[in-house]
């Protein structure tokens, strides 16, 4: 049996079935593609909301990394640079700023001291400079007595302030002075009121003799020779009127300090002395009955540092010039209470009535406490105790 069109009925049925199946497959593929595209578009919309933040954070990290310019391969360069800089700073400090405990053997410096060796502070200062390998010349009225033992002491020589021959030999042997120490008598004990004759003799032997010797030396000095003046000023700043000798000496030193500041050949500094202690006993201001600072740390090392700063390397001199505000601040404080008393109204707290006595303060506090307790009732006093 045949259908119109010339094909068998069976072939036509198979052709219709094949066409239906193929169309169904194409429709399924189109639906699948449409679903996939819709899913992708939705996922893209959701992801676009988070990616800018990630990109911004990544860009910030990249910028920070780029500005630092430190990668894993550059870490050794950074470490090497830090090590080299630290080494240079350490060597520079050791070479130009840190002071050795004493002078090198090849280096020779001369210090002239105007003072009497009978004073314990002056004697200890001479011995400290001698231990640090300085050549020390001592200008004292008792030079004839010390010259008898001069051969037994190397690098310590004595000059009579009234002998011109000693000064001529000194100028020939010493081409340049490192420093001059103007040290009047610094220890007065017992202290108090003295006669006019004794006061006149004390001023002459402690100050006027060395003042005249210094005036003789100044024309032969080079420019900016260091002069350090020692001032026992604690008594004057405390207004202890019963100790007139120390007050007069301190006032004279203050006046000479202002006078010598006008000399171009001198670079003048002044040390105001507090309470200093040699061994277990205080060596000055003994009437205050207070323990003092160790003389080696409070006086000897600062003086050594001042001398080396004025005669050392240019960088050390520059540092000293900066720390003293261009030489305007040339007053130093050495010893216990020396700096504290320089504060305003300090003399009102530590005056002649208290005399640094903590016992009196303790007694006053005890009396005040007992008076308050006596006013209170008996029960409250027991509870307070």
Curated annotation (Swiss-Prot):
Pfam families the record matches: DUF1776 (PF08643)
Gene that specifies this protein: YSD83
Family under the similarity heading: Belongs to the UPF0744 family.
Upper lineage: Eukaryota, Fungi, Dikarya, Ascomycota, Saccharomycotina
Name this protein carries in UniProt: UPF0744 protein YSD83
Domain of life: Eukaryota
UniProt-listed InterPro entries: DUF1776_fun
């Amino acid at each position: 049996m045949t259908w119109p069109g010339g094909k068998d009925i069976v072939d036509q049925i198979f052709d219709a079935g094949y066409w239906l199946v193929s169309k169904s497959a194409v429709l399924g593929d189109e639906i699948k593609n449409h679903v996939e595209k819709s899913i992708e578009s939705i996922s893209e919309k959701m992801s676009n909301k988070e990616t800018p933040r990630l990109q911004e954070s990544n860009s910030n990290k990249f910028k920070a990394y780029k500005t630092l310019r430190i990668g894993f391969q550059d870490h050794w360069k950074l470490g090497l640079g830090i090590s080299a800089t630290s080494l240079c700073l350490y060597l520079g400090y050791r070479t130009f700023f840190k002071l050795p405990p004493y002078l090198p053997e090849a280096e020779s410096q001369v210090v002239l001291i105007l003072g009497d060796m009978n004073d314990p502070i002056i004697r200890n200062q001479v011995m400290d400079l001698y231990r640090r390998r300085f050549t020390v010349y001592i200008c004292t009225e008792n030079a004839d007595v010390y010259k008898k033992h001069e051969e037994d002491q190397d690098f310590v020589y004595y000059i009579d302030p009234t002998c011109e021959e000693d000064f001529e030999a000194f100028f020939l042997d010493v081409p340049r002075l490192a420093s001059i120490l103007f040290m009047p008598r610094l220890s007065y004990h017992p202290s108090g009121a003295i006669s006019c004759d004794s006061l006149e003799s004390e001023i002459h032997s402690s100050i006027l003799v060395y003042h005249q010797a210094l005036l003789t030396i100044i024309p032969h000095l080079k420019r900016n020779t260091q002069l350090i003046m020692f001032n026992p000023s604690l008594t004057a700043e405390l207004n202890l009127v019963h100790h007139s000798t120390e007050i007069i000496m301190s006032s004279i030193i203050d006046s000479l300090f202002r006078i010598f500041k006008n000399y171009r050949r001198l670079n003048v500094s002044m040390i105001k002395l507090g309470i200093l202690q040699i061994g277990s006993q205080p060596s000055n201001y003994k009437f205050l009955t207070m323990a003092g600072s160790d003389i080696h740390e409070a006086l000897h090392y600062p003086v050594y540092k001042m001398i080396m700063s004025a005669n050392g390397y240019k960088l050390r001199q520059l540092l000293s010039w900066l720390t003293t505000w261009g030489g305007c601040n040339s007053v130093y404080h050495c010893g216990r209470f020396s700096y504290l008393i320089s504060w305003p109204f300090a003399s009102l707290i530590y005056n002649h009535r208290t005399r640094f006595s903590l016992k009196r303060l303790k007694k006053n506090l005890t009396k005040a406490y007992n008076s308050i307790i006596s006013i209170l009732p008996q029960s409250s006093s027991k509870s307070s105790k």
